[in-house]
């Protein structure tokens, strides 16, 4: 028997079957770095329209976690896809470098500033620590395959950036948005500093829930309001609170002007509380025998005075819209120094804003003898006993509720009125302008708009001052007596900024005021406060985007972060940009959900359900992690586990195998001389290129709308269905057995070339390493990297008015699927081994029969059978298999006649008819020794 293997065009490629990504990717990264791939891309895109995705800076502390990976990969997918769309899309990564977490780490190692090191040395240690953390995180981000200007990132601790942050504050002051006030702010006693809204988390806490009686100063006057002459015992207004420690700061009781308040006789006293809450309060205090004597609207009780339950003064009843009937008594204990609503209503009535609590969370001397120096949370029980002893305590119980805590220490925080600097939301219309700007931004998902609108509408003034060591100084001078800002504040801030630009923030603390104030130095003092770190990152649209040359003065097109950043970076950036420039800093804002485990649980080291991106990259490779990110709908929670990553690896193998098949069958193909013109190609090949064209339209649309999971789904459908289970199966016969240089084979290779040229680009933003690897095996001259080009423009499809148009082949796909069902059943019944052992007769209605007959003898190649005949549907025998999908189709399968050709494996009756090639069929003889078979359709 002759060996005809050498006459076959067997697939061959150096592109490996196995990805071995964990081993292979680091080598690719080294090449990218050595070649300066990012620089090559920038040069290639120079002069094109820009798309700027501004990187929200991660905090320079600790190793990256899976959430960081999601964020950076999503950004990288967008930047790369924009590049392929024809944009110049520079990506400058950044880091947030100042603030408390770094201070705490340095304190753990070196002690607090002033103990072992001066404040200046402490800042230097903080700078060193941040730089070390950045180096570690940068290595991991690069390992993810994220392309960016990693050698020149922006750091909020860069001297120039620090200077520009000061300039941003100067602009806000110049626009009239800054004011100073002793307002209650979130205060962490462990940090000994104010906290931003975004630094507050909520945890369950058990607190005492108490009902307290404030006795009327003038019993008769209060009773007169109710039209009651006298009652048995004292008259008291009842408040309810879960923060007894705030009672020393009480200066009023707030009532609703609209609610009805009842006078209730119970147990030898008369109590005043909201009428709608009488039943629930009486039940809570254990009173069963009570009588409602009368009721009046809250407005009638305004300015009635009541005795403080343990301090030697009385307080007024005041009216406020913040009073609700959700819980309590309808009478709200009001301490202007310990709550924003309390502060607002106290200001309205001109009440004292008392703050008896020090920065350490202990009562200041002179508060009350048994409370001085006591921590406020420890004081709760003491105050409850004081109330019990005075007879003012009506009820006490323990209550579990959600309580604000410090994001860093996880400890309960307090509201505490301290002199702070605020960006005002309303004095110059910042709130109104911000709400207007929000409407001009595209929010992805769209629910983000309502979320941030609600936050802006309800947020208090922004406290931007902090009492910290490691931060950008506010760089202000205030008068020692009046505490007013220096009249030359803006000029002085620019002078400070110039010095900071040279020497960093230490220049402020080293500055002798006389150097820039002259004689005014005797009357003015430096403000010691630093800026909230959210001001640092929130001003990067000005301190970074506006000044980096690669952004060429363009505003950011997109901000992209986790959904917690509506109240964080998105908010601070919006506030600062609107206060500075009157406009939003971004055109689009995209948010992604948090990562959870396979059961939907929040990731936690204590549970042990975290997934380390480093482990994933070391075991599976970064492309698997990237594919998982892209294939997950980021608008909700993003589930990840070993099983989920395994599924991503399975999908990856399908895509890789498709690419390998395409490359292997381009063996010997030179696009410069072997390309077949579209009009001369086999129709099926043109259909396949058209499939790629249709897929590309869907994929590009999905990239444009940032629906990356749809990109992956469409890519998988193309590889698995249109290619894998149809086209690539059909072409094997022609590709392997036709003459090497025949139009039949070159047509097929032309299609494969167009398809892989498109496929590698679709993959590039997501599976960047694999796309780069494929790119290196593609035939023909090309740029060195796929990332410097654009989407493939060489695709074409069948015309709608052609007889064998897309609709024709869609019908053939269905027929092929139905015939496969019959073949699979025959194989299960041991009637045939493979499909080439079968011949089929298709009994079709007139319309379908016309389509099938149009293929002539090539129908069998589409069906992968050795024989295929078409007959009238009405002539089908009774035992013919009826298709459920195609009502006008019945199928009869029989064993193929003739002998098996050892070269093409088809069964035919002409095997051995040519003496010189006695073992093979006539078709193979033509392909081996003749002019080669002709294919028109398949």
Curated annotation (Swiss-Prot):
EC class: ligase
EC number: 6.1.1.5
Localization annotation: Cytoplasm
Gene Ontology MF, one: tRNA binding
GO terms, biological process: isoleucyl-tRNA aminoacylation
Cofactor: Zn(2+)
Entry annotated with the keyword Metal-binding: yes
Residues bound to L-isoleucyl-5'-AMP: 561
Main location as per UniProt: cytoplasm
GO CC terms of this entry: cytosol
Motif annotated as 'KMSKS' region, chain positions: 602-606
Keywords for the protein's UniProt record, in alphabetical order: Aminoacyl-tRNA synthetase, ATP-binding, Cytoplasm, Ligase, Metal-binding, Nucleotide-binding, Protein biosynthesis, Zinc
Annotated CDD domains: Anticodon_Ia_Ile_BEm, IleRS_core
Cofactor-binding details, from the entry: Binds 1 zinc ion per subunit.
PROSITE patterns recorded: AA_TRNA_LIGASE_I
List of residues binding Zn(2+): 901, 904, 921, 924
Chain span(s) of sequence motif 'HIGH' region: 58-68
Keyword Transferase: no
NCBIfam families named in the record: ileS (TIGR00392)
Domain notes: IleRS has two distinct active sites: one for aminoacylation and one for editing. The misactivated valine is translocated from the active site to the editing site, which sterically excludes the correctly activated isoleucine. The single editing site contains two valyl binding pockets, one specific for each substrate (Val-AMP or Val-tRNA(Ile)).
Family the UniProt entry places it in: Belongs to the class-I aminoacyl-tRNA synthetase family. IleS type 1 subfamily.
Quaternary structure annotation from Swiss-Prot or TrEMBL: Monomer.
Alphabetical list of PANTHER family matching this protein: ISOLEUCINE--TRNA LIGASE, MITOCHONDRIAL, SOLEUCYL-TRNA SYNTHETASE
Protein purpose: Catalyzes the attachment of isoleucine to tRNA(Ile). As IleRS can inadvertently accommodate and process structurally similar amino acids such as valine, to avoid such errors it has two additional distinct tRNA(Ile)-dependent editing activities. One activity is designated as 'pretransfer' editing and involves the hydrolysis of activated Val-AMP. The other activity is designated 'posttransfer' editing and involves deacylation of mischarged Val-tRNA(Ile).
Full protein name: Isoleucine--tRNA ligase
Organism: Klebsiella pneumoniae (strain 342)
């Amino acid at each position: 028997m002759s060996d005809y293997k050498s006459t076959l065009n067997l697939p061959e490629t150096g592109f490996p079957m196995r990805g071995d990504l964990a081993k292979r990717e680091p080598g690719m990264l080294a090449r990218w770095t050595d070649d300066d791939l990012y620089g090559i891309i920038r040069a290639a895109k120079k002069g094109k329209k820009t798309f700027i995705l501004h990187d929200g800076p991660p905090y320079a502390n600790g190793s990256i976690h899976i959430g960081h990976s999601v964020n950076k990969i999503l950004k990288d997918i967008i930047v790369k896809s924009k590049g392929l769309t024809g944009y110049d899309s520079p990506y400058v990564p950044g880091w947030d470098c100042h603030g408390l977490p770094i201070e705490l780490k340095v304190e753990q190692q070196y002690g607090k500033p002033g103990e072992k090191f001066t404040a200046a040395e402490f800042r230097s240690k903080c700078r060193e620590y941040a730089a070390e953390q950045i180096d570690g995180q940068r290595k991991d981000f690069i390992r993810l395959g994220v392309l960016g200007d990693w050698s020149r990132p922006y750091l909020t601790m860069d001297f120039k950036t620090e200077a520009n942050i000061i300039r941003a504050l100067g602009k806000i002051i110049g626009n009239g948005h800054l004011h100073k006030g002793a307002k209650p702010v979130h205060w962490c006693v462990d940090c000994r500093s104010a906290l931003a809204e975004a630094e507050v988390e909520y945890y369950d806490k058990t607190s005492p829930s108490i009902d307290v009686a404030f006795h009327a100063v003038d019993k008769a006057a209060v009773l007169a309001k109710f039209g009651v002459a006298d009652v048995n015992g004292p008259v008291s207004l009842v408040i309810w609170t879960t923060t007894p420690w705030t009672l020393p700061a009480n200066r009023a009781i707030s009532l609703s002007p609209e609610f009805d308040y009842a006078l209730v006789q119970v147990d030898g006293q008369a109590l005043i509380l909201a009428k709608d809450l009488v039943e629930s309060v009486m039940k809570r205090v254990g009173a069963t025998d009570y009588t409602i004597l009368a009721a009046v609207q809250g407005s009638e009780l305004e300015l009635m005075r009541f005795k403080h339950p343990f301090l030697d003064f009385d307080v007024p009843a005041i009216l406020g819209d913040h009073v609700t009937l959700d819980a309590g008594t309808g009478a709200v204990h009001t301490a202007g120094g310990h709550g924003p609503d309390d502060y607002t209503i106290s200001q309205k009535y001109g009440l004292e804003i008392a703050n008896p609590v020090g920065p350490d969370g202990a009562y200041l001397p002179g508060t009350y003898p048994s409370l001085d120096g006591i921590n406020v949370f420890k004081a709760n029980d003491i105050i409850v006993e004081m109330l019990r002893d005075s007879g003012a305590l009506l009820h006490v119980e323990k209550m579990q509720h959600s309580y604000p805590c410090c994001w860093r220490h996880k400890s309960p925080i307090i509201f505490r009125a301290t002199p702070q600097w605020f960006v005002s939301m309303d004095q110059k219309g910042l709130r109104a302008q911000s709400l207007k700007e929000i409407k001009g931004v595209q929010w992805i998902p769209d629910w983000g708009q309502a979320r941030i609108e609600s936050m802006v509408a309800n947020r208090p003034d922004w406290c931007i001052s902090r009492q910290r060591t490691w931060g950008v100084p506010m760089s202000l001078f205030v008068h020692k007596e009046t505490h007013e800002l220096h009249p030359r504040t803006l000029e002085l801030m620019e002078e400070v900024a110039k010095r900071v630009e040279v020497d960093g923030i230490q220049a402020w603390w080293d500055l002798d005021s006389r150097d820039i104030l002259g004689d005014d130095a005797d009357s003015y003092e430096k403000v010691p406060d630093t800026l909230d770190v959210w001001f640092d990152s929130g001003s990067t649209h000005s301190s970074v985007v506006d000044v980096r040359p690669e952004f060429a003065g363009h505003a950011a097109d997109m901000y992209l972060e986790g959904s917690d950043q509506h109240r964080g970076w998105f908010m601070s950036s919006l506030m600062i940009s609107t206060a500075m420039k009157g406009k939003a800093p971004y055109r689009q804002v995209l948010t992604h959900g948090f990562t959870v485990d396979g059961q939907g649980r929040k990731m936690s080291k204590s549970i042990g359900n975290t997934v380390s991106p480093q482990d994933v990259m070391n075991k599976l490779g970064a492309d698997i992690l990237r594919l998982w990110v892209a294939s997950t709908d980021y608008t909700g929670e993003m589930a990840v586990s070993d099983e989920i990553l395994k599924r991503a690896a399975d999908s990856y193998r399908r895509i890789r195998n498709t690419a390998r098949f395409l490359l292997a069958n381009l063996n010997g193909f030179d696009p410069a001389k072997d390309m077949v013109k579209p009009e001369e190609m086999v129709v099926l090949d043109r259909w396949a290129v058209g499939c790629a064209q249709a897929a590309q339209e869907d994929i590009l649309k999905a990239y444009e709308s940032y629906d990356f999971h749809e990109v992956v789904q469409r890519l998988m459908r193309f590889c698995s269905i249109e290619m894998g289970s149809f086209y690539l199966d059909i072409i094997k016969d022609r590709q392997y057995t036709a003459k090497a240089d025949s139009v039949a084979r070159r047509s097929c290779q032309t299609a494969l070339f167009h398809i892989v040229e498109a496929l590698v680009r679709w993959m590039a933003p997501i599976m960047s390493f694999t796309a780069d690897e494929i790119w290196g095996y593609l035939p023909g001259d090309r740029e060195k990297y796929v990332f410097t080009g654009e989407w493939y423009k060489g695709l074409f499809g069948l015309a709608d008015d052609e007889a064998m148009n897309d609709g024709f082949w869609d019908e053939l796909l269905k027929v092929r699927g139905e015939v496969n069902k019959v073949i699979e059943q025959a194989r299960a019944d041991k009637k045939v081994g493979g499909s080439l052992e079968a011949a089929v007769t298709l009994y079709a209605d007139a319309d379908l029969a016309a389509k099938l007959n149009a293929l002539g003898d090539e129908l069998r190649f589409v069906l992968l059978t050795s024989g295929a005949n078409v007959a009238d549907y009405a002539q089908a025998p009774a035992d013919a298999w009826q298709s459920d999908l195609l009502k006008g189709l019945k199928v009869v399968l029989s064993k193929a006649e003739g002998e098996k050709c050892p070269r093409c494996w088809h069964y035919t009756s002409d095997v051995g008819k040519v003496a010189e090639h006695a073992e093979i069929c006539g078709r193979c003889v033509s392909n081996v020794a003749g002019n080669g078979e002709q294919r028109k359709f398949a």
